[in-house]
From Swiss-Prot:
pH-activity relationship: Optimum pH is 4.5.
Key words of the record: Hydrolase, Menaquinone biosynthesis
Protein family according to the UniProt entry: Belongs to the PNP/UDP phosphorylase family. Futalosine hydrolase subfamily.
Top-tier EC class: hydrolase
GO MF annotation list: adenosylhomocysteine nucleosidase activity; hydrolase activity, hydrolyzing N-glycosyl compounds; methylthioadenosine nucleosidase activity
Pathway: Quinol/quinone metabolism; menaquinone biosynthesis
Secretion signal, residue range per the UniProt entry: none
Thermal dependence of activity, per record: Optimum temperature is 80 degrees Celsius.
Role noted for this protein: Catalyzes the hydrolysis of futalosine (FL) to dehypoxanthine futalosine (DHFL) and hypoxanthine, a step in the biosynthesis of menaquinone (MK, vitamin K2). Is highly specific to futalosine since it does not accept aminodeoxyfutalosine (AFL), or any structurally related nucleotides and nucleosides as substrate.
Record's subunit section: Homotetramer.
Name of the protein: Futalosine hydrolase
EC number of the protein: 3.2.2.26
GO biological process, one term: nucleoside metabolic process
Length: 225
């Protein structure tokens, strides 16, 4: 059973199920999945996952949605899996490490600004769906110019930017949830002129990937014979 999450319902119009409400969030219950619309931004994404996981068992979770493409990154309209998220607006310009304390500590492992998604689940999905993997960058404030986007991409080695991924990845680590992230590139990061965006193509790529994921999940659950 998948817990599916997206920042907005705009990114999930293809999902069909029984509407329900969970605390402050709206969602759907369908075959092989529960879906929640988290709302935009880091706090919303982390709260939705943590609140749901506190009251319900979560086998695996997928955050999916649109993202901005950095120069040299994935093509517009392409869907990719995110293997690691960078929280680029936490701490100093160079991150938390110069300050000497982590954002998250699990045993001997300390995480500063980089948070991996579940590598096994991500690899499994990449092979099954035939998708590339990339490094994502998360900020509550998106890039407003191409120059700003390029500087962030170079500083952190990221291929795309969004507003939720690092919070989701960090919450998954803290809660022990196997998490994966799927993003489709709708626009060049830092370009606000929507004439250069490819939102329709990106939404179609998201729909294809999530539908295939759910179809394969259904096949895996179907008894032989």
């Amino acid at each position: 059973m998948w817990l599916l999450l997206s920042p907005t319902r705009l990114e999930a119009p293809f999902l069909e199920g029984e509407p329900f409400a969970f605390l402050a969030w709206r969602g759907l219950k369908g075959t092989g999945f529960v879906y929640l619309e988290t709302g935009i931004g880091k706090v919303n994404a982390a709260m939705a996952l943590a609140a749901y996981a506190a009251r319900n068992p979560v086998e695996k979770a997928l955050l999916f949605g649109l993202a901005g493409a950095y120069p040299g990154g994935p093509s517009l309209g392409e869907a990719v899996l995110v293997e690691e998220e960078v929280e680029a607006d936490l701490g100093l310009k160079e991150g938390l490490a110069p300050l000497g304390f982590p954002a998250l500590a699990l045993g001997e492992r300390r995480y500063f600004n980089r948070f991996p998604l579940d590598p096994g689940l991500t690899g499994e999905l990449a092979r099954g769906l035939g998708l590339k993997v990339a490094v994502g960058l998360t900020r509550d404030l998106v890039s407003e110019t191409p120059e700003e986007a390029l500087a962030l991409a170079r500083r952190w080695g990221a291929s795309l930017e969004n507003m939720e991924g690092a919070a989701f990845a960090r919450a998954c680590l803290a809660l022990g949830v196997r998490g994966a992230e799927l993003r489709a590139l709708s626009n060049p990061a830092g370009v606000r002129d929507k004439a250069h965006w490819r939102t329709k193509e990106a939404l179609s790529a998201l729909a294809r990937a999530v539908r295939r994921l759910l179809a394969e999940e259904g096949g895996a659950r179907r008894p032989p014979g």
